[in-house]
Amino acid sequence: MSDWDETEHPRDTRGRFRDKSGGWVEQVADRLVDPGYVRGQPIDLDPDVIERLARVRARDMAEFVELGSDRVGGDSRLAEIAQMQGWDAPGETGTPQQLQDLLEQGGVRLWRGVTPPVSSVDWTGGLFPGKGSPQWPTEAIAQTVRDHKTGPVRYGYGIYGNGMYTSVNADSASAYAMDGEREAAIRMVLRPGARVAQWEDREEWYDEYERRLGEMGLPEDTRRNLTDYGLAAMLLGYDAIHVPPGWDDGTDWDDAQYVVLNRTAVLFEAEPGDDWED
């Protein structure tokens, strides 16, 4: 993104932005549908965008070689696109009633189980069963949950596209939550009106994206750097990818999944609940 130029965003005498027809304030206001929700828009793959994504990808690969896959902080290409879209803002949290209100308006309840990074493990013994097990400090669990909501955006890797994987099934989330603890799970609601790409319709949106990539005549390594379902969906302005039931989710349930790409498109619970009830 280009540097901020204050002269392009004039303010009134009290420091508030003056609205100009067709200007920056109006453009941003059009994208703020609900408080805290920034609606995405298609991003052109111009040379500057391609160079930015190549740069962060090279950094990810260097970290992978140096630190190993368990220490790499996710796909930085998607974090870069989130910044371009304005999706890198802290997530919004709400009360149980506020989440329920969104559900009644057509939102989708989602769950995500988390485990703190390996670097926070306190090893009390050996690596094998019966010789001790890793112990995650309580604060590490709480910090991981907070980071998902309001920390720097981080996107994991997955077969249906990189992003933040969630499930409509609390049982699926418990399988990924540290020791199945409720404190290591996050309940959230995908806002009504969120723009969702359908996994089973990917021939329509992803194949079209790849076709356009092919027409650009990019070098093979550059083109390969731009091929991921989650990355493509973000560039197209989608908030999430919906994967219907029946596709492998890594648990025994294989329920519907949503790969969340726009953190502002969900409302998180402010504090972990004390149960797994829907």
Model-derived regions: residue spans:
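Charge-dense, low-complexity polyampholytic segments
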Residues: 23-31
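IQ-motif-like calmodulin-binding regions
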Residues: 2-14, 18, 25
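Small disulfide-bonded, cysteine-rich extracellular recognition modules and tandem repeats
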Residues: 18-20, 114
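Short hydrophobic alpha-helical segments that form membrane-spanning helices or hydrophobic packing faces
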Residues: 21-23, 176-177
